[in-house]
Swiss-Prot record:
Component of the mitochondrial ribosome small subunit. The keyword Transit peptide applies. Its main location: mitochondrion. It comes from the Eukaryota. This is Small ribosomal subunit protein mS77 (rPPR2). It is found in: Mitochondrion. Required for karyogamy during female gametophyte development, when the two polar nuclei fuse to form the diploid central cell nucleus. GO terms for biological process: karyogamy; polar nucleus fusion. Keywords: Developmental protein, Karyogamy, Mitochondrion, Ribonucleoprotein, Ribosomal protein, Transit peptide. Residues 1-28 form a transit peptide.
């Protein structure tokens, strides 16, 4: 971990934290409490950061939201409902981001403390502030998927080892959060009426103990997988509908901007001409050779000439003759029985093939003589 180094510019920024205003996003106020657990540090940080620049947003707590109503301006019920839904979405997003950053800081604090055992708590907090600032920038830029992937162009302020550790910790935190989400979702399906009904039936037929517990979680997991599958289908349908609506709007705009003319030129849409011959290769086999065309024609002709009819049923005297053929000895001549069999059955090609196959299974000597 000794290679886990900050550059000279980053160390300089840490030394200027007390006099220089850092740029944080709206979610960073929840992380300052995680980095420093004392109210004294928060008060000193607030005193040191006057927020004189209007463009820098001041950290806003979710408990300090006020709605101002006057006689002249009142929100309608519909707009209030929309605002409430937007606030709920923002709160959910803020909660997810805060949970991610809290877990990230907890793990990263241990790694930084291990890499710099001689640094005091204030210096460690300064390093964590710089690291979390970069992570928040990535979240604001591309979401959590951006954080979980490797950075396209690492910052010059951090070393390559530090960046690798940051993305490793981020992936670990995202995986843990996904496991927690699935675990909480699993609890809902374990207590669902369908799963409870199946467990009740299993208990009635004598299933108890660990087996019943395993079956209960198995049924809940299957139900959760089905629900996620149908949710993905719903999302795909909504996406397709939005694409169709956008295409319809674009088509209407084009029709509105279209100016009809007396002479309309007809245009033929065709694929561009390809130069040279097409080459088809399947598993390294060159199929563009003309011999494969001839072979395909022969196979097609053979399929047309093939007789796909079923053989005639062998009954009565014909069946007795067939039994005599199967009971022939090695020195017996089957020609007389074959002539009688052919006279009774009037066989086709399929019947002869069926006879040969039956003799091959029942009498090998007669099969060889008939085949010859």
């Amino acid at each position: 971990m000794k290679s886990f180094l900050l550059s000279r510019q980053a160390i300089h920024r840490i030394s200027l934290l007390s006099s220089k205003t850092p740029t944080f996003c709206r979610n960073f106020s929840a992380i300052t409490s995680t980095i420093s657990h004392s109210d004294r540090h928060l008060r000193s940080y607030d005193e040191q950061t006057p927020f004189q620049n209007v463009e820098i947003p001041r950290p806003i707590s979710s408990f300090n939201r006020y709605f101002h109503f006057t006689r002249e301006s009142r929100l309608s019920e519909s707009s209030a409902a929309i605002d409430d839904s937007n606030d709920q979405e923002e709160d959910d997003e803020d909660g997810t981001t805060n949970e991610f950053l809290s877990r990230f800081v907890w793990i990263m604090r241990g790694k930084v403390s291990e890499a710099y055992p001689d640094c005091d708590k204030k210096m460690i907090d300064g390093m964590l502030l710089l690291i979390v600032e970069k992570v928040v920038e990535e979240i604001e830029r591309g979401g959590f998927n951006k954080v979980g992937s490797a950075p396209p162009s690492p910052s010059s302020e951090f070393s390559d080892d530090l960046w690798a550790t940051i993305w490793e910790v981020s992936n670990t935190v995202l995986k843990d959060m996904e496991k927690e989400r699935k675990k909480e979702k699993m609890k809902q399906y374990v207590q669902s009426p369908e799963v409870m009904e199946m467990c009740r039936f299993a208990g009635e037929i004598g299933i108890r103990g660990d087996l019943l517990r395993e079956l209960r979680f198995k049924w809940a997991r299957e139900k959760m997988d089905d629900a996620e599958f149908y949710e993905s289908l719903e999302q795909q349908r909504d996406l397709d509908n939005s694409i169709r609506e956008s295409e319809t709007v674009d088509g209407e705009v084009e029709e509105e901007g279209f100016v009809p003319s007396d002479e309309v030129e007809s245009r033929s849409i065709s694929l561009p001409k390809r130069k040279g011959k097409l080459k088809y290769k399947i598993y390294g086999l060159e199929l563009s050779d003309p011999k494969w065309v001839e072979m395909a024609d022969k196979i097609h002709e053979a399929e047309e000439e093939a007789d796909w009819r079923e053989p005639k049923p062998v009954t009565g005297k014909c069946k007795l003759v067939m039994e005599k053929l199967e009971s022939l000895q090695e020195g017996d001549d089957p020609s007389g029985l074959l002539a009688e069999w052919a006279e009774l059955l009037e066989p086709n090609r399929v019947d002869w093939i069926a006879l040969i196959n039956q003799l091959r299974e029942g009498n090998t000597h007669a099969y060889l003589k008939v085949r010859l």
